[in-house]
């Protein structure tokens, strides 16, 4: 288009915002203001704000194109973004302006923000980390984009019915998603099944089933900068919408059967994998993400450069965990089959562009796929994986000619218990960099899981300790504390969290400590009001708020927390008139729908809560609350209110954790094991300002190898014996006394895999130290303030800068 293009740029004044909101409501949403509901007003406000973001977005895109920069493409099955409006207002600095505009229109901004659904694009720490990283990429002006799936229903909505988790569809798109741009012209065919046709040295993948991936783009705003990036999500569509012949014959279900089958790929996050069909759907889902993404990356590169010669110089593809590892054979397939690369050239490029983050060392959590299943669905990719494996093993064999045990250990194909493809092995063999997410995790990674690979490729492995974005997790989630920090050290900590260290001299002043305490109390009152309104439970904000919020999993040891709660309950019952530090134990988190034990733990928590909360002897000395349907928006209310943060995983099991960082940043003290990033947090905040308990990773391993006997702990510790016997005998489930016998057996008789009983006494004794300190409020708040002041290292901005410099080799765009 060569003709001059003019438009009226939307301004940021209050009057302009009012006009824009009214215009959007009437002419985009098509609603009469006199009858519009809150959702419609919210969408109008979102669209008005989005308009003001688009110019920055297009300017960033133009700058990336004109400066011909190297870009990173971040692939993740999850992006747990949280609500968009508050974050956008914060980034643009127009929160007060929009608040005033809506107020003058008779509307309340905070009420409208509560109407926004959390996007159902993730589940736990993996997805939230990806979201923090996108925020930091944009804020630092680094060229990159995220790629994920636009799930129709997210994971699930968690309801608690009779104390048990019940799952229902999380239809987060119920009122639309005005923040996204649907790209009707950006579609790619994704193929499954079929057969291979050999034509000389070339291979054709033919007679495949096809579905279409359509792009949906979301703007990722940088904070206080024109720099913005894109999150591109793929939605599945049938290649043929409807079988008209069958429809006209009256067979209406058969007419749309193919369409529904195709679109199932982007219906839900992590379909239940307890059945073969569920596992197959997961595999299709992972391939759907990577196929559309890699095609898009190559298409964008060709449009910009019209050559493949510089492909490895211009793109970096990062794999967030093993779910997107099929991107490796997909890139090889496209380069060889579609773009006529030789195998060697394709492999060289592939090794140069990929990097991989490992998020777990637990063998049961490392993805493997049966060779038969991949062969059925992705036959071409299976042949490429075999070729990569053969090439790799032959190369290593030249150096270790007779070490067949080594060959078996490092082979991408696991020949034991049925042939399976080890996705983490494939990622490590091909990626030029592999990183862990905390110093402890990265050390364990090269000492245990990838020890053979670390010996072969010592320069390939590195550490990038996780971080969190201070914009969402402090500035947005905790305005009361942010105001205290602003008064003390100014506002620029939002983009340079290391400035929090400037708080240290202020900690000697009682007035500053009092301000920190006042902010905490305001946040506790806010949470207590939310719980009263939504759960009809009364909490005392003067009590110590003891919080464990994360997905429910045995290694995260919510059950250890419950054992302490029961012990505390027993002590109160034994001496109800003593001066107890009042406590509120808060739990939240989802259990995977097929994870029976985790769901059983939720049931136990609620049964224990029911018993304790209704015991007249206990009253306000102890309360237990399980808050359902945990997500980002709930976390933004709960985390600022916490006094004590529970980070109690078995040492050596949590790769990093990020909720530990969020809690400390918001002035909670941590009780935790020396696991994940807790180790580095202790180094930064000081050992005296964190409550560490339990066995270390070497001690855990020593117990395991020497023969751990949990029954010994059960029989020798009277309080532990009492708590476990109460669980087993039905004290908390009198209507079904044997309900939790299996949990008791797992701990006492069947090995206690995560060593709860070994750490119980240390944990309970450390909780007594927590009580002792909480009785000294000034000292408690002083230590909380020291935690805040020393959390600057744990910014996602620092993490992303390290990735940019040492793994991706990308530089900021000049705007």
State what each model feature region is.
Residues 1-815:
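A conserved ligand/cofactor-binding region detector
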């Amino acid at each position: 288009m060569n003709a001059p293009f003019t438009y009226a740029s939307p301004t940021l004044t209050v009057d302009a915002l009012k006009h824009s909101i009214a215009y959007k409501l009437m002419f985009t949403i098509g609603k009469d203001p006199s009858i519009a509901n809150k959702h419609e007003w919210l969408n109008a406000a979102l669209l008005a704000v989005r308009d003001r973001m688009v110019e920055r977005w297009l300017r960033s895109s133009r700058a990336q194109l004109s400066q011909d920069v190297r870009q990173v493409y971040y692939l993740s099955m999850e992006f747990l973004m949280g609500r968009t409006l508050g974050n956008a207002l914060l980034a643009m600095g127009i929160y007060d302006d929009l608040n005033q505009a809506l107020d003058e229109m008779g509307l309340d901004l905070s009420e409208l923000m509560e109407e926004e659904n959390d996007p159902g694009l993730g589940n736990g720490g993996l997805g939230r980390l990806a979201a923090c990283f996108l925020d930091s990429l944009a804020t630092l002006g680094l060229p990159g984009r995220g790629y994920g799936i636009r799930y129709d229903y997210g994971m699930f909505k968690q309801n608690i019915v009779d104390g048990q988790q019940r799952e229902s569809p999380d239809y987060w798109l119920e009122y639309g998603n005005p923040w996204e741009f649907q790209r009707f012209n950006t579609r790619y065919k994704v193929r499954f099944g079929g057969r291979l046709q050999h034509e000389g040295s070339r291979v054709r993948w033919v007679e495949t089933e096809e579905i279409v991936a359509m792009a949906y783009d979301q703007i990722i705003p940088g904070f206080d900068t024109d720099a913005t990036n894109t999150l591109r999500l793929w939605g599945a569509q049938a290649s043929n919408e409807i079988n008209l012949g069958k429809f006209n014959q009256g067979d209406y279900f058969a007419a749309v059967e193919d369409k529904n089958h195709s679109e199932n790929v982007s219906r839900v996050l992590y379909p239940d994998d307890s059945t073969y069909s569920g596992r197959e759907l997961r595999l299709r889902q992972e391939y759907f993400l990577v196929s559309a993404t890699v095609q898009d990356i190559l298409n964008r590169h060709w449009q910009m450069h019209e050559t493949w010669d510089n492909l490895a110089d211009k793109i970096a593809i990062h794999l967030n965990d093993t779910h997107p590892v099929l991107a490796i054979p997909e890139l090889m397939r496209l380069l060889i089959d579609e773009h006529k690369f030789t195998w060697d050239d394709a492999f060289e490029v592939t090794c140069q562009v990929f990097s991989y983050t490992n998020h777990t060392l637990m063998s049961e959590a490392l993805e493997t796929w049966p060779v038969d299943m991949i062969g059925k669905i992705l036959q071409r990719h299976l042949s490429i994986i075999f070729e990569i494996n053969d090439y790799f093993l032959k190369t290593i064999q030249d150096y270790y000619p007779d070490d067949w045990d080594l060959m078996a250990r490092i082979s991408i194909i696991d020949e034991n218990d049925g042939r399976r493809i080890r996705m983490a092995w494939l990622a490590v063999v091909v990626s030029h960099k592999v990183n862990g997410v905390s110093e402890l995790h990265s050390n364990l990674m090269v000492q245990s899981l990838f020890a053979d690979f670390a010996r072969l490729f010592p320069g390939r492995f590195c550490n990038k300790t996780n971080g969190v974005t201070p914009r969402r997790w402090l500035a947005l989630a905790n305005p009361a504390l942010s105001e205290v920090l602003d008064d003390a050290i100014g506002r620029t900590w939002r983009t340079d969290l290391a400035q929090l260290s400037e708080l240290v001299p202020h900690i000697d002043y009682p007035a500053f400590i009092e301000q920190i305490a006042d902010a905490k109390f305001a946040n506790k009152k806010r949470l207590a009001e939310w719980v009263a309104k939504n759960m009809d439970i009364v909490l005392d904000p003067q009590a110590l708020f003891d919080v464990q919020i994360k997905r429910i999993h045995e290694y995260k040891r919510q059950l250890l927390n419950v054992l302490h709660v029961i012990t505390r309950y027993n002590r109160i019952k034994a001496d109800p008139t003593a001066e107890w530090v009042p406590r509120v134990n808060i739990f939240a988190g989802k259990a995977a729908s097929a994870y029976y034990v985790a769901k059983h733990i939720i049931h136990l928590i609620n049964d224990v809560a029911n018993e304790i909360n209704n015991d007249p002897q206990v009253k306000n000395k102890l309360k237990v609350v399980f808050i359902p349907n945990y997500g980002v928006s709930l976390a933004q209310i709960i985390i600022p209110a916490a006094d004590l943060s529970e980070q109690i995983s078995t040492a050596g099991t949590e790769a990093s954790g990020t909720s530990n960082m969020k809690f400390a940043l918001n002035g909670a003290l941590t009780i935790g094991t020396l696991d994940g990033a807790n180790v580095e947090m202790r180094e930064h905040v000081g050992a005296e300002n964190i409550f560490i308990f339990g066995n270390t990773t070497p001690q855990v391993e020593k117990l395991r190898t020497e023969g751990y006997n949990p029954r010994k702990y059960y029989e020798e510790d009277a309080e532990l014996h009492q708590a476990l016997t109460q669980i087993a005998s039905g004290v908390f489930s009198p209507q079904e006394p044997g309900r939790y016998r299996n949990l008791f057996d797992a701990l006492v008789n069947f090995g206690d895999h995560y060593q709860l009983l070994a750490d119980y006494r240390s944990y309970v004794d450390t909780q007594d130290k927590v009580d002792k300190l909480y009785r000294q409020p000034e000292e408690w708040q002083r230590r909380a303030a020291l935690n805040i002041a020393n959390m600057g290292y744990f910014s996602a901005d620092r993490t992303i800068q390290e990735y940019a410099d040492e793994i991706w080799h990308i530089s900021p765009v000049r705007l």
